[in-house]
Amino acid sequence: MIDRNCMDLFMMEAALTLQTSAARKARQANDVVALLEAQDPGSHIPPRLSASDEADMAAGRMESLGRHVGANLTEILLRDKPRLPDTLDRVKFVCKELWSVVWNKQIDNLRTNHRGVFVLQDQAFRALMALGQPDAAHVYVSMQLSFASGLLLGALDRLGIPCSVQADAEYPPVCSFHVRLMSI
């Protein structure tokens, strides 16, 4: 099991570090664009990166981190267990076992339409519990949801379920993850 305080601190520092890193990369890219514009104003030059591009870069890196953690934790947790027979059992494993290891609680609600769509709901998502005002930390919420989405993507991919995950936290700390299976 992952130490709760260690995980909280790790998530805060990872989000801050990735935001800082993305801002630095965007500044470097914008400096190159400015240099190209000064040297040859008539040539085709890519547009400058905006603040939303920075946020997307940071969220993408956070999701990648979550994918790595989810895939490797799933492999460790399933090392001595029999193979899970069907998709529903694999998703239940992620909701119960993996979520418990990372956030010390299970997913509160799992729904499916039995046609390749699962909705996982967490009524008290630990990574968002400390937020007082929903709008005050939009970037933080986005980063935490990116990590959790990546965690789900990595775990399900390691279980042989290619999918896409869309996270929604309209009223933090309540959040839901819409998992859509890819057709094989």
Walk through the language-model features, giving the residues of each.
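N-terminal accessory segment detector
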Residues: 1-142, 183
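Short beta-strand
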Residues: 109-110, 165-170
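Eukaryote-biased feature marking scaffold/signaling PDZ-domain proteins and nuclear chromatin regulators
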Residues: 113-115, 147, 160, 172-174
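Mixed-charge, glycine-accented linear interaction segment located at domain edges/termini
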Residues: 148-162
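Structural signal for hydrophobic/aromatic residues that build the beta-strand cores
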Residues: 152, 165, 177-179
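C-terminal helix/juxtamembrane-tail motif
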Residues: 172-184
